[in-house]
UniProtKB/Swiss-Prot annotation:
Lineage: Bacteria, Pseudomonadati, Pseudomonadota, Alphaproteobacteria, Hyphomicrobiales
Disulfide bridges in this chain: none
Function description: Located at the top of the head of the 30S subunit, it contacts several helices of the 16S rRNA. In the 70S ribosome it contacts the 23S rRNA (bridge B1a) and protein L5 of the 50S subunit (bridge B1b), connecting the 2 subunits; these bridges are implicated in subunit movement. Contacts the tRNAs in the A and P-sites.
Record gene name: rpsM
UniProt GO MF annotations: rRNA binding; structural constituent of ribosome; tRNA binding
Keywords in alphabetical order: Ribonucleoprotein, Ribosomal protein, RNA-binding, rRNA-binding, tRNA-binding
Region described as Disordered: spans on this chain: 99-122
HAMAP family assigned: Ribosomal_uS13 (MF_01315)
Subunit structure comment from the entry: Part of the 30S ribosomal subunit. Forms a loose heterodimer with protein S19. Forms two bridges to the 50S subunit in the 70S ribosome.
Protein name, per record: Small ribosomal subunit protein uS13
The UniProt record lists the keyword Transmembrane: no
Family, similarity comment: Belongs to the universal ribosomal protein uS13 family.
NCBIfam families hit by this protein: uS13_bact
Length: 122
C-alpha cells in the first residue's frame, strides 16, 4: 500500500480514484496531479514505481493543501466567524444551518435528533 499525505492509498484502484481518498483531493485535482506527473490515467496504484509515488507525494506537498492543514484552516475559518459574532458565526455556534435553509421543518442533520416537549398530550 502506498502512503501519500499520511493516508494509505488502496493498491487495486486506478491512481485517479485512489488519490480521492485523501481529504482535499477530489476527482478534478486527482486528474490534474496525474497529468502533472505524467502517469497514464489507467495505471493502477500497485503498478507505480517508487519514483512515481515520490513525484505524486512532492506534487501534492508543493501545490495542494490537504488532510490536517486543510481541516485546521477550515476550523480556524469557522472559529473566526464565531469570534466576530457575525450572523454566520452565530448560526455555527447554535448548531443551525448556516446557508439560509429553512428550520421550521427539516434541518435535522444540523440540529440533531428531535427533542420531545412535555405537555403536548391530547
Amino acid at each position: 500500500m502506498a502512503r501519500i499525505a499520511g493516508v494509505n492509498i488502496p493498491t487495486a484502484k486506478r491512481v485517479v480514484i485512489a488519490l480521492t481518498y485523501i481529504h482535499g483531493i477530489g476527482t478534478k485535482f486527482a486528474q490534474e496531479i496525474v497529468e502533472k506527473v505524467g502517469i497514464p490515467a489507467e495505471r493502477r496504484v500497485h503498478q507505480l514505481t517508487d519514483a512515481e509515488v515520490l513525484q505524486i507525494r512532492e506534487t501534492i506537498d508543493r501545490d495542494y493543501q490537504v488532510e490536517g492543514d486543510l481541516r485546521r484552516e477550515t476550523s480556524m475559518n469557522i472559529k473566526r466567524l464565531m469570534d466576530l459574532g457575525c450572523y454566520r458565526g452565530l448560526r455555527h455556534r447554535r448548531g443551525l444551518p448556516v446557508r439560509g435553509q429553512r428550520t421550521h421543518t427539516n434541518a435535522r442533520t444540523r440540529k440533531g435528533p428531535a427533542k420531545a416537549i412535555a405537555g403536548k398530550k391530547k
